[in-house]
């Protein structure tokens, strides 16, 4: 995911992803479009322009582009002339799904119809959202959300309460779609932690507390009625 759906409204929006400037906007059908924020004519920022008749219009010379990146209007040459096919915008495939704008960063022919998401959250939930910039590399942020040893120290008054410093396992299952972690921290009374075999048996009786779904969403199951979702945006 790149951003929340509610952030993309009537005006074009500029964002930087992967070290490149992009413009995000909605076409006449309210479909979200992600394109390079640079007019191929003379490099003006399209995010400073407007959306007119379902086309994003350059603020410099009025060149207008559709959701596929094709230049549909070049006012200076007149409406009787078809603009050059070289006037195209880089337009990656995106989806507006479950409150997020998702980017398919690969071959469009291999894209799935819907992005990966948590089935438990598909319906029936009330929620609020916050945005937060973390001054760390994306991989470190994800790694931190799968670490259970820091809980009694960093989150001592919430999910880490009880000073359960002894880490049993944790028991982890993974496949090509996700990583699932069962948190079994205990108070340290000098006992030995349970074996992974014992933890595996215990895991069959409950849901994993932590689930990371590739490439960038994470779910914390706090209780049956309270969950925390994090979307990692590069």
Annotate each predicted stretch with a short phrase:
Residues 1-4, 137:
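Helix N-cap / beta->alpha transition motif
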Residues 3-122, 227:
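Rieske [2Fe-2S] iron-sulfur-binding domain
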Residues 31, 109-234:
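C-terminal catalytic domain of Rieske-type non-heme iron oxygenases
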């Amino acid at each position: 995911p790149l951003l929340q759906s509610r952030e993309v409204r009537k005006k074009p929006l500029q964002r930087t992803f992967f070290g490149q400037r992009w413009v995000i906007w909605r076409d006449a059908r309210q479909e979200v479009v992600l394109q390079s924020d640079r007019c191929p004519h003379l490099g003006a920022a399209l995010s400073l322009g407007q959306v007119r008749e379902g086309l994003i219009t350059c603020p410099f010379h009025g060149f207008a582009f559709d959701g596929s990146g094709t230049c549909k209007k070049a006012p200076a040459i007149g409406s009787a002339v078809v603009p050059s096919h070289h006037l195209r915008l880089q337009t990656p495939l995106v989806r507006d799904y479950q409150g997020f704008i998702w980017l398919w960063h690969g071959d469009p022919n291999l894209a799935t119809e819907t992005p990966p998401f948590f089935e438990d959250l598909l319906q029936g939930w009330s929620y609020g959202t916050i945005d937060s910039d973390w001054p760390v590399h994306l991989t470190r942020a994800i790694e931190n959300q799968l670490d259970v040893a820091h809980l009694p120290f960093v989150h001592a008054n919430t999910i880490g309460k009880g000073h359960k410093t002894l880490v049993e396992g944790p028991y982890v299952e993974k496949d090509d779609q996700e990583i699932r972690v069962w948190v079994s921290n205990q108070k340290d009374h000098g006992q030995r932690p349970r074996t992974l075999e014992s933890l595996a048996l215990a895991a069959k009786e409950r849901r994993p507390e932590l689930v990371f779904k590739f490439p960038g969403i994470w779910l914390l199951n706090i209780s049956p009625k309270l969950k925390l979702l994090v979307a990692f945006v590069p």
